[in-house]
Amino acid sequence: MKIKVQTLDGKAGADIDLNDDVFGLDARADILHRVVAWQLEKRRGPARAARERSDVARTGKKFGRQKGGGTARHGDRRAPIFIGGGKAHGPRARTFGHSLNKKIRTLGLKMALSDKAKGGKLVVIDTLELKDAKTKALAGKLGKLDLGKRALFIDGDAVHESFAMASANLIGVDALPAIGANVYDIVRADTLVLTRAAVEKLEARCNG
C-alpha cells in the first residue's frame, strides 16, 4: 500500500510503501473489542476490601443477656448494627485484569492500523519538528490538515520536544512515541497521524 507523505503545512511529498501485513488487514470487531477490554481492565485498580464482622478485631462475647434486659437481643459487638462493627455485605478484594495472548494483542494493533489506513483516516508526515514551539502556530497548521475532532500523533523513539510543548494545551490532540501505540487510543481517534520514524518502528514491532 502506498500513501503520500505530507508535511505539517499540508504540502505533499514522496510516496511511502506501507507493509500490507501491518496496514492491509481486514479489521475484526471481536478482536478489537477483546484488546480494548483487556487494556481498560488492565489499567483499572483493584477493589479494596471492607472489613466484615469476621474481620473486625473486637470481642466475641455476647453483649448483654438474652432475656430480661429490656432491650433488643444482641450477639457480639462486631455486628454491623454497632459503631465500629463490621460492614454488612461489604466489597471484597478483587482484581479485574485478565490475560490476553501477545499474538492477539499484536493482531489487534495491526487491525487498528489497517482500519485507519483503509478508511482514509491515516496521514503520514515527514517529521513533527517545529521551528517554534508555539501553540497558536501549530493550531493553524493542524486546521489546514482537517484531522477531525480528535487526532492521535505517533512519533518514533520519542515525540519531538517542540511538538510536545506546542500541542500540550490543544484539545483533541494526543501525541505518543511508537512504543506507546495502542489499540484503544488508535480506535477512538478520528485521524491517525504517523511520522516516517513511527511507520518504521510500528512495522518492526508488529513483525518482530
Swiss-Prot record:
InterPro entries registered for this protein in UniProt: Ribosomal_uL4, Ribosomal_uL4-like, Ribosomal_uL4_dom_sf
Disordered, as annotated region: 47-84
Entry keyword annotation includes Ribosomal protein: yes
Keyword Nucleotide-binding: no
Gene Ontology MF annotations: rRNA binding; structural constituent of ribosome
Example GO biological process: translation
Ranges of compositional bias, category Basic and acidic residues: 47-58
Keywords of this entry: Ribonucleoprotein, Ribosomal protein, RNA-binding, rRNA-binding
GO CC list: ribonucleoprotein complex; ribosome
Family: Belongs to the universal ribosomal protein uL4 family.
Function: One of the primary rRNA binding proteins, this protein initially binds near the 5'-end of the 23S rRNA. It is important during the early stages of 50S assembly. It makes multiple contacts with different domains of the 23S rRNA in the assembled 50S subunit and ribosome.
PANTHER family given in the database record: 50S RIBOSOMAL PROTEIN L4, LARGE RIBOSOMAL SUBUNIT PROTEIN UL4M
Oligomeric and partner information: Part of the 50S ribosomal subunit.
Protein name: Large ribosomal subunit protein uL4
Gene: rplD
